[in-house]
Amino acid sequence: MGEDVKNLNYAQLKKLRHEVESNIASNQVGQAIADHEETISHCLHCNSHQLNRWGMTRQGIQRFKCKSCNKTFNALADSPLYRMKKSEKWIEYTKLMWEGVSLRKSAKALDITLRTSFRWRHMFIKAPASFNPSELTGVIEADETFLPESFKGKRVIDRKSRKRGGGRIKQVPIFIALDRSGAVSHKVLERNTKENIQAQLKPLLSSGSVLCTDGNLSYKGIAKELDVDHKRLIPLDNQLVIDGVYHIQTLNNYMKRWKGWLKRFNGIGTDYVENYLSWFRFMEDNGEYSDQTWIKEAL
């Protein structure tokens, strides 16, 4: 076979490489799905644990039939990958996502439509976006950041056309809180009010935690109402660190990295900000890319 490969021209080698990489990707996706199939223990319809294996789909995905309700489902029915086609391209697509490649360039690289590229992006983000920590511990840093309101990706804009030079663009508030263990919680707020901030912050506070914020008076009132130890860091008073431990620099650095990463997308629609927050958090949590990282998360 080695001699045969040597006799191939550049175009043939390129085609062979593509076929080999596609086969490897398909095997890795198949292995991840097979591993997932072994974890299925209850019916998606009635939650019964009385299941029978019930053949395969045309794509080779295991089907199950519930003895209790007689309904059937396949192993991907409860995952974002359900009904997604072209599985041989999934891993390469997630690699392009990790690199922050645009939808258009990803579509061209994998010979898929722009619509498919868009749908895949948000399908792979769906699993990370479904998770938000229920509680933060220890030293908790909290603050808001802002992005210009954007209707990018919307067919219908729910406002009158903006006149040229017609004032400032509305800023969308985003609440972010994290602890020193690396857990991050985020939420796009309708308005930057004390009530909205408190609604997001209150469930995150745990016993014995210390809240670190900037000088925003909303946090002062919230901390008093919730009876939580509160450290206010006020730059104008040159107070950036208290007792060598309490600061919001970890959070500020996180926000800076996120906004720096966002620049490659040339603006994102406000409706999708939560997804991009989750996407970035997912990559930060994993540290580096591996071929099955996103596939396993989606399952």
For the regions a protein language model found, what residue spans apply to each?
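Residue-level recognition of single "structural anchor" positions
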Residues: M1-L299
